[in-house]
Each structure stands twice: as C-alpha cells, then as structure tokens.
Design a protein with these regions (language model features):
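A short N-terminal helical cap/helix-turn-helix that marks the beginning
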Residues: 1-21, 41
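Residue-level recognition of oxygen-bearing side chains
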Residues: 2, 64, 89, 124, ...
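Aromatic/hydrophobic pocket-lining residues that form π-stacking "cages" and hydrophobic walls in ligand
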Residues: 7, 93, 138
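Solvent-exposed, charged/polar functional surfaces in cytosolic regulatory/catalytic domains
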Residues: 9, 13, 64-68, 144
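Residue-level preference for short coil/turn positions at secondary-structure junctions
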Residues: 14-16, 76, 121-124
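Conserved AMP-binding/adenylate-forming core of the ANL superfamily
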Residues: 20-87, 91-94, 112-117
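Structural core segment of the AMP-binding/adenylate-forming
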Residues: 71-72, 99-162
C-alpha cells in the first residue's frame, strides 16, 4: 500500500474528520465568537489563525491538482518542483503530483533565485509550482527556468479550488 492509497483509504473511511490543520499565530482569527464563548470577566488573548481541511476535501484537492497536471501532459517520469511556504496547501499539491506518477522535487523556501535555478536545472524539473511570495525570486531567473520548465503560480490554482 502506497502513501497515496493511505490518503484514499482515509478519505473513504473518514471523509468528514479533520486531516490537516494550519495555525498561524501572526494572523488574527476570522471566526466569530459567540456570546457563550466570550469571557465577560477578563479578556482573552486573540486566537491564532486556524484553517483545517477534512480527509474528503484533502483527497478532492489532490485529485483536482492531479487532473490538472495530467491534462497538461505531466505523468510518470516527469518531475514537478514545489516552492511554497509551509502551508495547508502543500500536502494536497504533493499528493496530487504523486497521483500522476510524477516525481516531487521539494525546494527549500529559503533558497535564493540562483539556488532555485540551480536546483531546478539539477533535478531537470518539468514544472515549478510556487507561491506568491516567491514571484520576485522566480522572475529574477525566469528566462533561464522557463526554457526547460513550466511555471505554475499557486494563485492560478484557486480556480481549481486547490
């Protein structure tokens, strides 16, 4: 049983259970607090930003990304690099790549433009999926990268609900 099969099994058996949680203490909580949760005597500290997805949603997002890759000719033997911050979207993208049979090339978010270019060249990556925070670094070497590698900005994946 592969790791992809484990995701499929969990999505089938526990579709509504929480699979992934993202907590960012630097972002304010957007959830409304009800009167019963509100502390009348003493104010509590702000809750950190929290986002979660269920096993069913996790599987759905991975499938959508896998389908997008497959429709664009990415499959077995191809290499897809991921340049994202540590976020809840990272794993569905990772599993989506694995579902196509392609290889995942995770890149460290601390890499400079030249290091990104070097790693993509060394890995012979066919696609680079990157977050908005990396636009500047990717643009700095886009001329060299785009000759061999298709660039895919994460914000473009919003239409796929990924």
């Amino acid at each position: 049983m592969t790791i992809v099969h484990l995701l499929e099994k969990n999505a089938r058996e526990f579709p509504n259970d929480v699979a992934l949680v993202e907590i960012n203490p630097e972002q304010p909580e957007t959830r409304r607090i009800t009167w019963s949760e509100f502390e009348l005597v003493e104010s509590s500290a702000r809750r950190p930003y929290r986002r979660e997805i269920t096993w069913g949603v996790f599987e759905e997002k991975a499938n959508r990304f896998a389908n997008m890759l497959t429709q664009n000719g990415i499959g077995k033997g191809k290499k897809v690099a991921i340049l994202l911050m540590n976020c809840i979207d990272w794993l569905p993208i990772y599993f989506g790549i694995l579902k196509t049979g392609a290889l995942v090339v995770p890149l460290n978010f601390r890499y400079s433009s030249d290091e990104i270019d070097y790693c993509l060249d060394l890995a012979e990556a066919d696609v680079l999926v990157f977050g908005n925070e990396f636009v500047g670094r990717v643009e700095a070497v886009a001329d060299k990268i785009s000759k061999n590698c298709t660039l895919c900005k994460k914000s473009l994946l919003i239409n796929l609900n990924i």
